[in-house]
């Protein structure tokens, strides 16, 4: 599964439908836990529902081919780059508590691209 930003640029992918999210350069950047997206530093980054990754304010950060339901208009998708060899995953830090879910927004988040995973 590929995660595209608000411009249709492929930023990251879910490795073999596992819980781990990688950038195309091979860097592991996050993982899914239930319906939440966490950084390896333990920070709760956002939510993954219906093919959308949303920030903590409910705004859309990424979409996938499977995105359904409410959200902003999806742009045309750019071609996916080749996937580089995956780097070793860092150890997961203790997860911070999940934030309360915000109402689902219909616009794009101001946080996008790789920056989302660096929080």
What are these regions (language model features)?
Residues 19-21, 37, 53:
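Hydrophobic residues embedded in beta-strands of well-ordered beta-sheets
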Residues 6, 24, 40-41, 56:
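Tandem-repeat architecture and repeat-register "anchor" residues
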Residues 1-9, 50-119:
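Long terminal segments
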Residues 27-28, 44-45, 60, 68:
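Extracellular beta-strand scaffolds
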Residues 1-31:
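N-terminal leader/targeting segments and the first structural element of proteins
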């Amino acid at each position: 599964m590929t995660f595209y930003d608000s411009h249709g640029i492929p930023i990251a992918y879910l490795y073999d439908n596992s819980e781990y999210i990688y950038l195309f350069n091979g860097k592991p950047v996050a993982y899914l836990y239930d319906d939440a997206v966490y950084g390896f530093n333990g920070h709760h980054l956002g939510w993954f529902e219906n093919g959308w990754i949303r920030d903590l304010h409910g705004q859309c950060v990424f979409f996938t081919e499977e995105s359904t339901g409410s959200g902003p208009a999806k742009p045309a998708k750019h071609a996916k780059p080749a996937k580089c060899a995956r780097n070793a995953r860092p150890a997961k830090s203790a997860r911070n508590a999940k934030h309360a879910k915000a109402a689902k927004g219909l616009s794009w988040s101001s946080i996008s691209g790789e920056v989302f995973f660096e929080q």
